[in-house]
Amino acid sequence: EEIKSKERKGKECKKRSSVLDGLPSHLPALLRAYRTGEKASGIGFDWPDATGPLEKYNEEWTELREALDSPEDRDSIKEELGDVLFSLANYSRHIGFDPEDALRGAINKFHQRFRHVERSALSTGKNLRELGIDRLNVLWEDAKRLL
C-alpha cells in the first residue's frame, strides 16, 4: 500500500508539473487561449486591469503589421497573427466576455447581413458574382443599416 501511495504521488507530480497541464489540447484555440489566461492569472501572472492586455494587443498588432511588410516570411506573419488572437482572448477575459461567444455573435451577424445581400441580389435577377464588388459593398452597407 505504501508503494502504491508513493507511485500515485509520483504520477501526480508528473501530471502537475505546470499549472497549464490541466488544459485539454483539444479545446477550440480561442477557448484554450482564454483558459490559459485564466490559469496564469490564478497564480498571479496577470495584468491588474484591462489596460495591460489592451496595450499588449496594440503591441502585437504593430508587430503583425511589421511582419506583413515581408509577405514571403509566412512563419513570422502566422506567429504574429497568433499573438494578436491570444492577446484579444486575454483582453476579452479582462473585460468579462467569453471570446467564443463574442466571435459566434460576429459570425451570426455576418451571416444575417450576407444573406440579406444574397436576397437583394436575387431580387435584381443577378447572382452575386455578376454584381461586382462596388455593388456588393452598397448592398452590404444597406444590410448593416437594416439589420
Regions found by a protein language model. Give the residues of each.
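Flexible "arm" and connector segments at domain edges
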Residues: 1-81, 85-147
